[in-house]
Amino acid sequence: MAKDGGVSCLRRSEMIGIGIGELESPPLDSDQVHVLAVDDSLVDRIVIERLLRITSCKVTAVDSGWRALEFLGLDDDKAAVEFDRLKVDLIITDYCMPGMTGYELLKKIKESTSFKEVPVVIMSSENVMTRIDRCLEEGAEDFLLKPVKLADVKRLRSYLTRDVKVAAEGNKRKLTTPPPPPPLSATSSMESSDSTVESPLSMVDDEDSLTMSPESATSLVDSPMRSPGLA
């Protein structure tokens, strides 16, 4: 049954997700991407929720910007309940919603100290450039046109997990790569030079060894060989 000017009420699973009711939401997997999806259209909300779950995201779906602020604990400047346990990696919201537009929700999030670093993606069925530019200038991470496709969701999820994967691979490469050899000290360099014995021939320059006048060559050939001990 619709309330609040035609905005659909939260389903039971959504109520559990934001802590309404007797049941408590299960603890979040630290490695699982948690997405807050905001859309006043029940059909669009179901579609985006299913697409996100296909990509192994945990999804909390709400039907208005005010509900999103309540979940984040940003309504009336209140602190979020159990803020340390609350983990939101991405907020994806529709632009045209009654009561509070996606643009207004974006501004509220970016003005907060707790969630201003969380990526916010805006969805809309209308391709209006002024609207897109305004959202991007306000800090939106991306602007998706409806209907949202699975490829769009996969791209957003890979963007969110890219830093973690690169860091893990970087640490792995650092562990497997042997460290470079230490630089030689001045003492070791001197010891190395002292231990090297150079041949007398190596002291002669190449040009000197090849340069000999004809007179010198003739004198060497014509000089008699003398045996040792003979005068």
UniProtKB/Swiss-Prot annotation:
PROSITE patterns, sorted: RESPONSE_REGULATORY (PS50110)
Nucleus keyword on record: yes
GO molecular function: phosphorelay response regulator activity
Low complexity compositional bias, start-end: 185-199
GO cellular component: cytoplasm; nucleus
Principal location listed in the UniProt entry: nucleus
Entry keyword set: Cytokinin signaling pathway, Nucleus, Phosphoprotein, Transcription, Transcription regulation, Two-component regulatory system
Location(s) in or outside the cell: Nucleus
Domain of life: Eukaryota
Stated family: Belongs to the ARR family. Type-A subfamily.
Record function comment: Functions as a response regulator involved in His-to-Asp phosphorelay signal transduction system. Phosphorylation of the Asp residue in the receiver domain activates the ability of the protein to promote the transcription of target genes. Type-A response regulators seem to act as negative regulators of the cytokinin signaling.
Name this polypeptide is given: Two-component response regulator ARR3
Source organism per UniProt: Arabidopsis thaliana
